Swiss-Prot record:
This is Large ribosomal subunit protein bL20. It comes from the Bacteria. Keywords: Ribonucleoprotein, Ribosomal protein, RNA-binding, rRNA-binding. The gene is rplT. Binds directly to 23S ribosomal RNA and is necessary for the in vitro assembly process of the 50S ribosomal subunit. It is not involved in the protein synthesizing functions of that subunit. NCBIfam families: rplT_bact (TIGR01032).
Length: 119
């Protein structure tokens, strides 16, 4: 049986890595070994940060809701507890959007939360 050389497969694999490394600085976009290391690291960062993004957005929404709630004399936790007692099931993303874009509606929710805390 004749020897099979893997030149075609190797070239295809290396081209795929170098294509993923397009836009990297210096040797990282041109040399296979360095590019491969950077692509692997970049994929690890991408995997990690897809999960981190969810946490970051939740933090941002909570900060916005807290700031708006404090303008109405409530802390974030008391505001959320008041909404829960009132049976309002609006998620943090929507609450943060209301806090930024529709302050009148947020004020009504804050009043509702206050009323249910005092019961």
């Amino acid at each position: 049986m004749p020897r099979v050389k893997g030149g075609t497969v190797t070239r295809r694999r290396r081209k795929k890595v170098l294509k993923l490394a397009k836009g990297y600085f210096g040797a990282k976009h041109a040399l296979y070994r360095v590019a491969n290391q950077q692509v692997m690291k970049s994929l690890m960062y991408a995997y990690r940060d897809r999960r981190q993004r969810k946490r970051d957005f939740r933090k941002l929404w909570i900060a916005r809701i807290n700031a708006a709630a404090r303008m109405h004399g409530l802390s974030y936790s008391r505001f959320m507890h008041g909404l829960k007692l009132a049976g309002v099931e609006v998620n943090r993303k929507m609450l943060a959007d209301l806090a930024v874009n529709d302050q009148a509606a947020f004020a009504q929710l804050a009043d509702l939360a206050k009323a249910n805390l005092n019961k």
